[in-house]
Amino acid sequence: MIDVKLLRSNRELFEKNCEYRGVDKAPVEDFFRLDEEWRSINRELNGLRSQKNRETRKIAELIKNNGDASAEKKAVEDINARISDLENKLKKIEEERDRILWTIPNLVHESVPVCFGDENNQLVRYVGHAKVFRDDIEEFKKNSGNSQDYEVLDERPKSHVDLGLDLNVIDLESAARISGSRFYFIKNRLLKLEMALENYAVDFLSQRGFSIVEPPYMLNLESMRGATDLETFKDTLYKIEGEDLYLIATSEHSIAAMLSNQFLEEKDLPLRVAGISACFRREAGAHGKDTKGIFRVHQFNKIEQFVFCKPEDSWDFLEEILGNAEAIYRSLGIPYRVVNVCSGELGRLAAKKYDIEAWFPAQGKFREIVSASNDTDYQARSLNIKYRTSEGNRFVHTLNSTAIATTRILVAIMENFQEGDRIRIPDVLVPYTGFQYIEKG
């Protein structure tokens, strides 16, 4: 939720911000219309309350002097009726105005490219040594800043589906039969690799000052509304029938809501929290995309970074959590690029977002594996998370970033570390798996 005082004094800024994001500016217009009604009613209420006080004093004086106060009493009754009517109107206007506030997006940071479409995200850097099938060289160069750091493959690597089935580490048919599309069984050494990824990420973040939590996998409506953009996530979230509960799409939502309506002490900031959880997504808006395999699924495990900090520190923390994610993928040896997400693709909460996109040689393209966002005070206002200072109470800033979404990284490893009919385990994970290869037999 945006700062009402900031909005009132910067109407044009917020209308322009809607244009930057490619969303309707009608909510801003509606807010100012309702806010003027709210101010007008408040002015009338203040006048009526003053009038009531004057009439009440007259009544007291008349009674004291044995005078007739019937006219004044009738006037007070009429004033009370009018006050009650206006207070009811004011409450309805406040509710509608506050509802509209939830729909006005966060201000885009000045460093965000103002444009639309993922294809216009701004390349920040490319890192790594890629394996590129000869037919995909131009695609790779175009999206890596014309990097020459690659080796040419004469044959396209196997898809993770074909490789997983050949090695008996993925079962999609059984999952589809008992659960439907976009579900899966991960088996044998691939499951051990997934567990190794999780343990590696947890150790990595623990060494960098993050506390580790496993949050609730369900949130009530109030918490979910405060933590995320329900309108954007309406095609993503699973609602529990007959309950005021939603399955989480990411542990970010639970961690953010964990401190809702709380006051923090300035000395305790920043708070770095890493959440490990299953995530559940309907993917209703992804019809026809990635229908085979485990890249885009209804259920997956994820390690999430989350930071509560002081406003003046949040932009440094955005670079920190992005750097943490990059360090993980560099250590794994997965080639990737970082993009500065353009204004039209940010979502309502983020003031700025970076994506990390890994190179997938079997698919011949970069695909998103990490999103790192600074939501400034927008999410904290929605959840009412403040900290105490010597100069008064302030809202914290909140930031989040994927560390590892396991199914997508499994696919990245399967495509980038194929060696014939086997998969080589990245060196940093061997101490966690206890083996160097996934192979037949």
From Swiss-Prot:
The pathway noted for it is: Aminoacyl-tRNA biosynthesis; selenocysteinyl-tRNA(Sec) biosynthesis; L-seryl-tRNA(Sec) from L-serine and tRNA(Sec): step 1/1
Return the broad EC class.
ligase
Q: Does the keyword RNA-binding apply?
A: no
Cellular component GO terms held in the UniProt record: cytoplasm
One GO term in the molecular function aspect is: ATP binding
Q: Where in the cell is it found?
A: Cytoplasm
Q: Identify the Pfam families for this entry.
A: Seryl_tRNA_N (PF02403), tRNA-synt_2b (PF00587)
Catalytic reactions of this protein: tRNA(Ser) + L-serine + ATP = L-seryl-tRNA(Ser) + AMP + diphosphate + H(+); tRNA(Sec) + L-serine + ATP = L-seryl-tRNA(Sec) + AMP + diphosphate + H(+)
Q: Name any Gene Ontology BP term.
A: seryl-tRNA aminoacylation
Q: Which residues are noted in the entry as ATP-binding? A: 281-283, 297, 368-371
Could you list this entry's UniProt keywords, alphabetically sorted: Aminoacyl-tRNA synthetase, ATP-binding, Cytoplasm, Ligase, Nucleotide-binding, Protein biosynthesis
- Per the record's keyword annotation, is Nucleotide-binding included, yes or no? yes
Assembly description: Homodimer. The tRNA molecule binds across the dimer.
Note on domains (UniProt): Consists of two distinct domains, a catalytic core and a N-terminal extension that is involved in tRNA binding.
Function recorded in the entry: Catalyzes the attachment of serine to tRNA(Ser). Is also able to aminoacylate tRNA(Sec) with serine, to form the misacylated tRNA L-seryl-tRNA(Sec), which will be further converted into selenocysteinyl-tRNA(Sec).
Any idea what this protein is called?
A: Serine--tRNA ligase
Report the source organism. Answer: Thermoplasma acidophilum (strain ATCC 25905 / DSM 1728 / JCM 9062 / NBRC 15155 / AMRC-C165)
